[in-house]
């Protein structure tokens, strides 16, 4: 691990092989937390590239519980709708609310989420408040998709390997250090939907997230970042100001555009 840390301290990007080694070391319960912390801090200081982030996610998904949605004969396209959080506006959970609307249009919504960390209402919190069981095993999740066209994957139940980084993540969070784990939550859906919309808290991250989703095999992906009427950032499509939308996918090159409510006949 020391060699990887020194590599990152020289501001050198990791090769795909080095990303795999680094990701496996992070998930190794026997690896010391101080080394994991040094690796994560060095990676953060260098700045994670889209290729590196996609590589880490691919390794982490290999350790995730597979819900085996390929066993199903689903009629509609599969999609996840989520956000990074972190905009600090204390909004209600828009993506979790929208999952039911999206499912009603005929798409099959494979929602992957957790309890709130940067907000008061994570996806799991909202569904639990509605009396919905959030920790269904894979068979129950598939049953929901077949019967209702919508299902929820509770992140802790599908990523048991992340127990190996709980301590170091808490340690770095207390120091105010942002790591790759603050970025990848929306990318870790073990059902691997065909389509995905991700709201991001930083406007400049939109192209990177679109590229990452493309690298992860999404047929169609949108990364969006909105602004309020007074210019504050929101990790949603905004009804109050402009929204940057970066579109990408297996069958399309990156498209970067700006939309406003008036483009759709709405006044704000």
Sequence positions of predicted segments:
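Short, mixed-charge, low-aromatic patches
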Residues: 10-17, 51-57, 81-83, 97-102, ...
């Amino acid at each position: 691990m020391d060699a990887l840390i020194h590599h990152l301290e020289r501001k050198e990007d990791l090769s795909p092989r080095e990303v795999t080694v680094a990701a496996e070391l992070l998930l190794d319960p026997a690896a010391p937390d101080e080394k994991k912390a040094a690796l994560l801090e060095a990676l953060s200081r260098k700045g994670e590239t889209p290729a590196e982030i996609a590589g880490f996610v691919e390794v982490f998904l290999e350790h995730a519980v597979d819900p085996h949605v390929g066993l199903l004969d689903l009629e509609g396209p599969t999609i996840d709708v989520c956000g990074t959080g972190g905009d600090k506006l204390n909004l209600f959970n828009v993506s979790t609310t929208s999952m039911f609307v999206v499912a009603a249009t005929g798409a099959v919504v494979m929602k992957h989420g957790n309890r709130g960390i940067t907000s008061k209402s994570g996806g799991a919190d909202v569904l639990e408040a509605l009396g919905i069981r959030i920790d269904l095993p894979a068979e129950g999740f598939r049953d929901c998709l077949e019967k209702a066209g919508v299902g929820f994957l509770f992140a802790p139940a599908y990523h048991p390997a992340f127990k190996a980084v709980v301590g170091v993540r808490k340690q770095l969070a207390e120091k105010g250090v942002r790591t790759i784990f603050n970025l990848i939550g929306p990318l870790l859906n073990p059902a691997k939907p065909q389509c995905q919309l991700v709201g991001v808290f930083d406007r400049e991250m939109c192209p990177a997230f679109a590229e990452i989703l493309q690298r992860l095999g999404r047929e169609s992906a949108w990364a969006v970042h909105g602004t309020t009427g007074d210019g504050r950032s929101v990790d949603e499509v905004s009804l109050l100001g402009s929204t940057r939308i970066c579109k990408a996918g297996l069958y399309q090159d990156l498209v970067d555009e700006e939309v406003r409510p008036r483009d759709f006949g709405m006044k704000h």
